[in-house]
């Protein structure tokens, strides 16, 4: 009977080792995917900041042009004789 108990114990250890291996593999996959997600988010943030900065510069330029046009229109409205040909 001692032999049967030893085999059962060995089988239980084998099952436990297999389960532990599967758990470690699962955790490894989760860790890798979390790392990939983090790297993507860092890259996304960097790209987004760069694009937003570029758009902000373009918007500032457009705002300055609009202000200049508003001044020209108000000047033309106030003094139409300046633009008469």
Swiss-Prot record:
It is found in: Cytoplasm, Cytoskeleton. GO terms for cellular component: cell periphery; cytoskeleton; plasma membrane; SCAR complex. InterPro entries: BRICK1. Expressed in roots, root hairs, hypocotyls, cotyledons, stems, leaves, trichomes, and flowers. Keywords: Coiled coil, Cytoplasm, Cytoskeleton. Residues 45-79 form a coiled coil. Its main location: cytoplasm. GO terms for molecular function: identical protein binding; protein-containing complex binding. Involved in regulation of actin and microtubule organization. Part of a WAVE complex that activates the Arp2/3 complex. This is Protein BRICK 1. It comes from Arabidopsis thaliana (Mouse-ear cress).
């Amino acid at each position: 009977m001692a032999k049967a108990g030893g085999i059962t114990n060995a089988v239980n250890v084998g099952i436990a080792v297999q389960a532990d291996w599967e758990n470690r593999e699962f955790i490894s996959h989760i860790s890798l995917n979390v790392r990939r997600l983090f790297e993507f988010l860092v890259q996304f943030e960097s790209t987004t900041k760069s694009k937003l900065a570029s758009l902000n510069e373009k918007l500032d330029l457009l705002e300055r042009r609009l202000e200049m046009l508003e001044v020209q229109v108000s000047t033309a409205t106030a003094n139409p004789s300046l633009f008469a040909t």
